[in-house]
Amino acid sequence: MEKGQLIEFRHQGERRLAVVDRPDGKKDWVVIDQQGQSHKLKPQRVEYEIPGGPYTVDDLPSFLGEVDQYLDPSSLEVAWELLIEEGESITPADLALLLFSEQSPSQCYAAHALLAEDKLYFKQKGNHYEPRPSSQIEEIKHQMRVQAQKEQEQQGFIDRVNQALAGEKVTWEGSDRLRLEALEKFILFPEQNHRQALDILQTLGKPGRTDETQNLLIELGIWQRHENLFLRRSAYPNQFPAKVSDVAHAYLTNPPPDPDQERFDLTTLKTYTIDDESTSEIDDGLSVETLADGGHRLWIHVADPTRLLSPNDELDLEARKRSTSLYLPTGMISMFPPELATGPMSLLQGQRCVALSFGVTLDEVGAVRDFTIAPSWVKPTYRLTYEDVDEMLVLKIQGEPELPLLAEAAKKRAQWRKSQGAITIKMPEAIIKVNADEEVQIYLQETSVSRQLVAEMMILAGEVAGRFCQEHGIPVPFRGQPQPELPSDEELLSLPPGPVRECAVRRCMPRSEVGITPSRHASLGLDLYSQATSPIRRYTDLITHFQMKAYLRGEPLPFSGEQVQEILYSVMPSSKEATLVERQTNRYWSLEFLRRNINEVWQGVMLRWLREDDGLGLILLEELGLELPHRFDRPISPGDRLSLKVSNADPHRDEIRFRELLANEA
């Protein structure tokens, strides 16, 4: 390089024109650009040398003015058309001669500038430029159009976000959904790669943090303040596919033919359905039939959703994918479309309903003497709550003799199961409800005669279903539980009676197992058991219905043992995930309840140690039935009582901390 030479180099990716001023050391030079700024350069950084000179910095404005009049990008297309046939490469000087018929310094630099900025017609190779093939140009044009559309959509999205944040009403475009989903996934799965979400947040001037992004979606009205992130992370569908909904609506007015035309008519029996007041899927009812010998047959009527289904049809496969209905504090998400689940599938008061009925007689000690199972017609007489039944039993209403008979049978069954080794654990259970205004209620579900009555009848139906399927070689999901190793009597007696002792027993109970081989269920005290009483809300029960009903009709079974096992392999993980979502959601709302009631004093009892070395124990808030961890800084034993106040509760972070009150504070 020489002093006074005009050169081009790049500074932070930007093309700069500069005049060489002086050498700096053996290899470097100092140049002064059009903005008057000095730069230290190595010769290798020079991208183009302008002919002519010598130049001074004062020459640059007029020189650039001359160059501007030649900078017409459309002229490159003309040059490309002239050169493509020959396929020859050119230099900026060649292009200047071709376009301007001269090769003045300003014309040569203008040609260089056109080629340097061109991304379409020419490709640089060394100091020369080759015309691109026409096919490559069309592909680049397509990519440029796609990129321009993306940029336009991105800018439109940013504009709509800012409008929404300013309180204006916006209509989101289809392309916005992908960007909003990118932000949602960033919150739900922060450990994954989220380049798009981070780019969006940077463009919006928002920090790349999940909590701030969640607040953004709430401000935009995309998410609720208490959005259920556990449900969103899960694979559980929140909506039914259009095809499934269409089938459901069609079946309301035009149901398929009933495969069980010869149903047993039990509509003359008085039938009670007993549920919580909020229950909308009514899947069981109870009756008592008086026999000629003065004895009684208990009838457990179970809703018959398979009357509307065929194995592997749209409704069946959707239910299989869901595996269970989801019961959350904010409401239920049904395994079937709700118009069916709460309509023709349910046992509705005063309506003629299809059912699968289990008729059972018991011996004097409560064991099953004989049973019958049949598809049936029933007509529920009363829809009762548990509280209704408890009150009617206390009042001994003469017009309802069936209820005391059912209660007595349930009591006898419980005693018989206990004699067979059944293990009953009585722990307080918290019921958490959240209404439309996001008001949270937590109350204890009390043990009652009515709840024991219904539970025993359902267990009885499960025993009968299991025995029937075993006797006839019908492969269905059997539920078993290994025998636990319980604490010794001495160990249990050393613990205070009540929740602490029950907790010690519960801790020893192994998980139940589901398979096609019958096995003993330890805590129920039954040699075999197959759940069959909740086919509207539990898919494994639905399989049992499909299989038993086909056998009763004398038809081939819809599923072989191998197929039932394969279905269980797919259903059980989904069912476990649904249970986890329920548990996580309940915990979230319990922490939110405690956060809102931070000034309340709660009475608790220490249940057991979680990590005694760390002082971490499990406590029970007795008024609420909530079991939560608490770190103690003093000596304490299971069964010790304490008064607590919440010191910090953050449901979003799943954090809860209590402060133990001193005697004079409580």
UniProtKB/Swiss-Prot annotation:
RNB domain residues: 263-553
Coiled coil: none
Record has Nuclease as a keyword: yes
Phenotype of gene-disrupted mutants: Essential, it cannot be deleted.
UniProt keyword list: Hydrolase, Nuclease
GO molecular function annotation: RNA binding; RNA nuclease activity
Pfam family, one: CSD_RNase_II
SMART domains documented for this protein: RNB
EC number: 3.1.-.-
Family: Belongs to the RNR ribonuclease family.
Name of protein: Uncharacterized ribonuclease sll1290
